[in-house]
Structures are given as structure tokens and as C-alpha cells.
Amino acid sequence: NFGDIIVCENPSFIGSLNCFRSYGCKLKCVPVEEDGMDMNALEKVLKENKNVRFIYTIPNFQNPSGRTMSLEKRKTLYELAKKYGVLILEDNPYGDLRVSGENVPTVKSMDEDGIVIYAGSFSKVLAPGIRVAYVIAPEPIVAKMTVCKQGQDVHTAMFNQMLVYEWMSTTDFEAHIGKIRDIYRRKMTLMC
């Protein structure tokens, strides 16, 4: 709703922030530390603002900082959202592309209360610019998100959706991700 508050990381992905603003939402920004969103600042924002609708976070390789939220902070984020009755929008376009270190469980994997909306993208793992994404959320939320998306661009290109469907139907996704990680690992090693 117009005037509702979305809590986001500072800095954050400008594309998402502009989308939220286009619906008349107010943004309350929380600093990003080395291990993710500042949880003390987040709780302060949640205490002081009663019309927060959701918390937007990019916990893996946060855009633009590149930082990854620690497991402890992910647990705290989930508990704060539960305590204050707000949703979490976990945007994870880069999570499958970790080339070193241990994977950190998603916030969605902790969700026993149906408060985490999980978003992923095929643009980072299949083809840049394909612009096909997905969400995992309760049906009423998916229905509202569908209406919002239709207002932005009518729908994702049908041809691109068909390409993704065919690719997912005929490809070993995990093997493909392994190859992509190897390519990125080699490029990272060359640059470092």
C-alpha cells in the first residue's frame, strides 16, 4: 500500500529499490556490516515503525557490497521478523554461484511460519539477460506479486519462459551449476 514501509539494506540493489518506490513505499535503510545487515539497527527500525510490511535482503553476495550474511544474523533476522510480525523478502540471485567457502543456509530454510518470500533468478545461472525469475511463497502472496508484476511489464517474455522450462526439463541443474562455478573460480583466481 502507498506509504507502507520496506526495510532494506544500505546499500542495496537499485532496481528493487526503484520498484518499491514506484508503488509509493517508503524505504528505511539499515547499514550492511562485514557479516550482513546490522541487526541492532534493524530492530530499532522495527520498534519505531509500525507499518513495516517486509524486510528486503540479499543475504548471499549482497548487491552491491558483495558481502554474505552470517548464519547467526540470518537466524536473528528471522526471529526479529517473527517478533514484529513482518515478512522477509530473501532475494538470492547469486546463492548458487559460491566458488569458495561453505554455503550458508537460506533464511527460507528456517521458515516454519510462512513469513519468508524467497526469490531466485535464472539470469545468473543460465543466460544473462534472460530475465526469468521465480518466487517461493504462500499462494496469496504469489497472487499479489503476480498482479504487481503485470502492472510493471505485463508478463515475462513467453519465449524466455519456454527456454527455461525446456532447459530445466532436459538438463542436470546441479551439474550445470558445478560447471558455472568452475568457470567463475578460474576467473576469480586469474583476477586475484
Predicted regions and their residues:
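Conserved PLP-anchoring active-site segment centered on the Schiff-base-forming lysine
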Residues: 1-14
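Short, intrinsically disordered, charge-balanced linker/junction segments flanking boundaries
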Residues: 3, 186-192
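Hydrophobic alpha-helical segments in the ANL/AMP-binding
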Residues: 15-22
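Helix C-cap/helix->beta junction micro-motif
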Residues: 23, 83-84, 114
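Short beta-strand->loop structural element characteristic of the AMP-binding/adenylate-forming
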Residues: 26-33
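Active-site phosphate-binding strand-loop segment of PLP-dependent enzymes
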Residues: 37-99
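Conserved core segment of the aminotransferase class I/II
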Residues: 112-182
